[in-house]
Amino acid sequence: MWRAKLRRGTCEPAVKGSPSACYSPSSPVQVLEDSTYFSPDFQLYSGRHETSALTVEATSSIREKVVEDPLCNFHSPNFLRISEVEMRGSEDAAAGTVLQRLIQEQLRYGTPTENMNLLAIQHQATGSAGPAHPTNNFSSTENLTQEDPQMVYQSARQEPQGQEHQVDNTVMEKQVRSTQPQQNNEELPTYEEAKAQSQFFRGQQQQQQQQGAVGHGYYMAGGTSQKSRTEGRPTVNRANSGQAHKDEALKELKQGHVRSLSERIMQLSLERNGAKQHLPGSGNGKGFKVGGGPSPAQPAGKVLDPRGPPPEYPFKTKQMMSPVSKTQEHGLFYGDQHPGMLHEMVKPYPAPQPVRTDVAVLRYQPPPEYGVTSRPCQLPFPSTMQQHSPMSSQTSSASGPLHSVSLPLPLPMALGAPQPPPAASPSQQLGPDAFAIVERAQQMVEILTEENRVLHQELQGYYDNADKLHKFEKELQRISEAYESLVKSTTKRESLDKAMRNKLEGEIRRLHDFNRDLRDRLETANRQLSSREYEGHEDKAAEGHYASQNKEFLKEKEKLEMELAAVRTASEDHRRHIEILDQALSNAQARVIKLEEELREKQAYVEKVEKLQQALTQLQSACEKREQMERRLRTWLERELDALRTQQKHGNGQPANMPEYNAPALLELVREKEERILALEADMTKWEQKYLEESTIRHFAMNAAATAAAERDTTIINHSRNGSYGESSLEAHIWQEEEEVVQANRRCQDMEYTIKNLHAKIIEKDAMIKVLQQRSRKDAGKTDSSSLRPARSVPSIAAATGTHSRQTSLTSSQLAEEKKEEKTWKGSIGLLLGKEHHEHASAPLLPPPPTSALSSIASTTAASSAHAKTGSKDSSTQTDKSAELFWPSMASLPSRGRLSTTPAHSPVLKHPAAKGTAEKLENSPGHGKSPDHRGRVSSLLHKPEFPDGEMMEVLI
């Protein structure tokens, strides 16, 4: 009993504290939820129990307060009859509504425990208000659950304010579960039915707790861990299961106790070799009181016990059960005496325990409890009986209470189960005295377990009653505090209501005055309206006249709107026509500007053509003069040749005197004549090129004049078309643009054809120029070679002159020689520009007058001819540079068509008219190897400017 008191004392401070600190099934929230809490007239326990004086005084004081104070009468429409509401005065009704608002606000924002307290106060006030109320003899929470199911449901369905998360899950679960039958509008059970149902639930929870959970390390009064309750409790216990489940559970509990205790006694007897059978009976009552007193594994509540109080223990069983009681004392309660021994005994336990996987024995390190094990443990001790050391026997005896309940096996099966033979020592073999001990122990265990169970139930009921008394004292204290706070708040609210009532009365008086003024104004308005009724007839006649005039005005307005729409459409048409004419005018002006620009360009071309014609006439006169001079020179040279030949024939006798007198003069004459011949040949080739350019320019001018005339005709036709088709100017404009495109395409094709023809002609002229240049080079070479010959070969000069006179036409042999000497014709064009350089270079080469005429003539002629060759080679670069004076940079020739910059080897040139010539010239190596020359020839078509007449005169 001392241990029970100590254990109860360990839990009482936690119970008096916050409910969440030691949340056992007997905590305030659980007590309010439990069905055994609902007892009539504050009598907590039915049957043989009595109500404590403290509880009776508290309830009587609360009821007196409720009856005396009218503010606590909470008149809800769900609780009072209509007659009772009518019987009360206006002040009581106002106070009741104020109290109802305050309680509802507190229910909305308070914690669940405070909500339950407030609801208890509310329903106590409701129950004490009416003397004829049918349920006023119930407790406050029973009144709550039976009379106001809707209020409980509303309080359970409040919006989450943050405090609901602090409550345990089972609280919320049981709150929702308690409201479900009330939602379905089912009749609530009576007190006896609710009590029986709660006791049945507690019996089921006790059995499941013994089968599936492990108790705490300390024994609190009637309390167990919430986790062990929820883990070891199957869903069958939450449903309304029948009495058959309870009977099976009791049978299972009984047989499990018998089997586990018999096995432990057998092990102890085997260890001691059957030596100790009768021990002194001192301490038996103490052992059983301590062992059977607190059962922390059982949940709060009383198992339904249809029998009376248990009978007294027979003395014979007390003597026989001394080993068991000592074993229980050592096995059950060494958690208080030796807290370290549990860890030492449980840790070296090596054998696998065939227990449920959801029950962890060492999860929270609690001490073992009586009658707590897992349900599906089948034959748990064959493995432990094979361990024969004293430590293993202590371990098995210590862990026996943890796994003392097996499946419900009958007693003969438990006794007749074949035990595995021990393997270690022969001293522990089973003997006949051991079987007798086992039988006596089993009988003793049956009696003790039954009476122990009854004692457990009784003691648990006392613990529950004590806990409930504590909870009721706390609840009453809280209810009194809440009542005082409600009284204060209602006094404040009444003062506010009085102030508001005064304010509203003043407002009502003001509105009465305002209403009176409005009625007066309404009467005056009615009088004025009645006086003006006779004037309404005249107004109606005037309105009819005005309506007829309005109709006429509307008709006129419609006509004017139609005319305005027609005028707008006409103005839009005129605007479109004006825009079209403006566009045509702008196109015509652009065309005129374009034609003026073309006219300026063509005038510039005409001026250039006139200048070129003047230059051509000058060139022709100069050419005639040069031809005359060439004739004179030729005749004079022929005469000198004849004279020299005659002298050579006849004057062999006097060879020494003639060279002395005639050698310097002859050398001067030969050098001048050669220079003159070379300059004339260069001028001839240049003027031939200028003539070709002039002819091409004239051809282009004629083509441009023809295209301008054609454009003039087309523009005149287009203007006449625009004038004649002025109405449909858009279509005419589109057609005109198409015609312009077609005309431009035609002009482009014509210009391309003319350009191709001109390319062919230019190529032909270029070939002729090459031939003439080559012929002039050959003539110059022949004259040089004839002058280099000695005096005896002078007749060959005449022969060379004859061949030169005969080679005036273009032959195929000259073309073949042209291919061989492709490099020599480049320098002949620039000899005119290189004449000064030739003179300056040949002057120092003149030797002093030699002794013999032949040697002096030969040396001088060789030097001059060699310099002529080098001058032609050196002046090739100068020719390319000086050609830029006559061949300016490429630019597009201004004309309406597109001029192709196609070179001579392009396939565009190979039309039938010029195909043969182009192929000849492309096959010739001279034409293929000089891209500069081809570029110059093709750039003839792109020269915007040509050399002026002044430059021509300078060149002449």
UniProtKB/Swiss-Prot annotation:
Purpose: Inhibits the Wnt/beta-catenin signaling pathway, probably by recruiting CTNNB1 to recycling endosomes and hence preventing its translocation to the nucleus.
GO biological process, one term: hippo signaling
Composition bias type Gly residues, residue spans: 282-294
Region named Disordered: 197-246, 274-322, 382-405, 411-430, 773-823, 841-880, 894-944
InterPro entries: Angiomotin, Angiomotin-like, Angiomotin_C
Annotated organism of origin: Homo sapiens
Composition-biased stretches (Low complexity): 852-866
Protein localization: Cell junction, Tight junction
Protein known as: Angiomotin-like protein 1
Record's compositionally biased regions (Polar residues): 382-398, 802-815
GO MF terms held by the record: identical protein binding
Residue numbers carrying Phosphoserine: 241, 269, 295, 720, 793, 805, 828, 900, 906
Taxonomic placement: Eukaryota, Metazoa, Chordata, Craniata, Vertebrata
Top-level taxon: Eukaryota
Key words of the record: Cell junction, Coiled coil, Phosphoprotein, Tight junction, Ubl conjugation, Wnt signaling pathway
Ubl conjugation is among the record's keywords: yes
UniProt PTM comment: Polyubiquitinated by NEDD4, leading to proteasomal degradation.
Residue numbers of Phosphothreonine PTMs: 902
Coiled coil: 259-279, 438-639, 665-694, 729-762
